């Protein structure tokens, strides 16, 4: 029985069987061609293969030179069009990267925990002074200014009026000074306290005394000037006010008159030394 009758099957079309037969024949022919090509390649020598490789390299180099010359000979419009095309490609790539980064940020934000540490872009330079959340700044540690004495929040207050309103604070200052003096005079406390604590308390006591003495001296000077102006304006219809320089002279005269003899001698000696130094510096050999 022939091959054709062996492959006959009921319910199968003859055209499909013929197509299968042709495919089998073509596949056999391709296999024969491939085997013949392999035989031809195996029979080639190394010299002929080297010549073929050199010829291919020369042809590729010639083609590259030709393409370069043709690209240089193109008009500027084509270069501009190529630049626009490359710019459009770059912009499309950047837009794609932007949207991808946005998607990543949105996805990371959805998974972000409320106690996670804060993130910052590495593209921005880090400032020398950084605001660290949760860390107390030095500004908060400073005492808040009293708005009653802030000139930017209202009119300038008269210092004499402010002093008269808060004169009662002198009693509290004097009480603190007496308590601190008694504490430093206590021998039991001095034995228990360290040397550093004792020095700090002594400095605090000196500062409090100096502050209270300064306030009292200002009150005295203000009272002296008030009495002097009242005396010179006693019979005048228009009030006469002293200049700053005259006020200073009046205050110095009052202090000098109310000093003790020993204090007056010390003041005069300091003034003589001051004048002597000024005259000595004014000599010719001290000038450049």
Curated annotation (Swiss-Prot):
Record region (Disordered): 1-150
Coiled-coil annotated spans: 184-219
Subcellular locations according to the entry: Nucleus, Nucleolus
UniProt entry tagged with the keyword Nucleus: yes
Family: Belongs to the RRP36 family.
Role summary: Component of the 90S pre-ribosome involved in the maturation of rRNAs. Required for early cleavages of the pre-RNAs in the 40S ribosomal subunit maturation pathway.
Name under which the protein is recorded: rRNA biogenesis protein RRP36
Species this protein is from: Eremothecium gossypii (strain ATCC 10895 / CBS 109.51 / FGSC 9923 / NRRL Y-1056)
Lineage of source species: Eukaryota, Fungi, Dikarya, Ascomycota, Saccharomycotina
Protein encoded by which gene: RRP36
């Amino acid at each position: 029985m022939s091959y054709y009758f062996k492959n006959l099957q009921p319910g199968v079309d003859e055209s499909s069987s013929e197509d299968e037969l042709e495919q089998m024949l073509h596949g056999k022919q391709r296999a024969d061609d491939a085997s013949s090509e392999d035989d031809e390649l195996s029979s080639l020598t190394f010299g002929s293969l080297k010549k073929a490789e050199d010829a291919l390299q020369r042809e590729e180099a010639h083609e590259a030179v030709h393409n370069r010359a043709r690209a240089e000979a193109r008009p500027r419009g084509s270069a501009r069009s190529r630049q626009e095309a490359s710019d459009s490609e770059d912009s499309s790539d950047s837009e794609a990267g932007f949207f991808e980064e946005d998607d990543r940020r949105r996805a990371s934000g959805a998974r972000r925990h409320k106690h996670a540490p804060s993130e910052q872009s590495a593209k921005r330079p880090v400032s020398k002074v950084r605001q660290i959340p949760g860390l107390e700044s030095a500004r908060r540690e400073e005492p808040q200014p009293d708005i009653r004495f802030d000139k930017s929040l209202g009119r300038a207050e008269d210092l004499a009026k402010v002093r008269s309103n808060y004169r009662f604070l002198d009693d509290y200052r004097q009480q603190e000074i007496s308590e601190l003096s008694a504490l430093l005079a206590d021998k039991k406390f001095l034995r228990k306290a360290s040397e550093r604590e004792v020095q700090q308390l002594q400095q605090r006591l000196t500062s409090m005394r100096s502050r209270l003495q300064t306030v009292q001296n200002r009150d005295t000077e203000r009272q002296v000037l008030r009495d002097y102006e009242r005396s010179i304006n006693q019979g005048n219809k228009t009030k006469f006010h002293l200049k700053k320089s005259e006020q200073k002279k009046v205050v110095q005269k009052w202090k000098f008159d109310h000093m003790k003899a020993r204090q007056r001698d010390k003041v005069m000696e300091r003034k003589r030394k001051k004048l002597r130094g000024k005259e000595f510096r004014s000599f010719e050999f001290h000038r450049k």
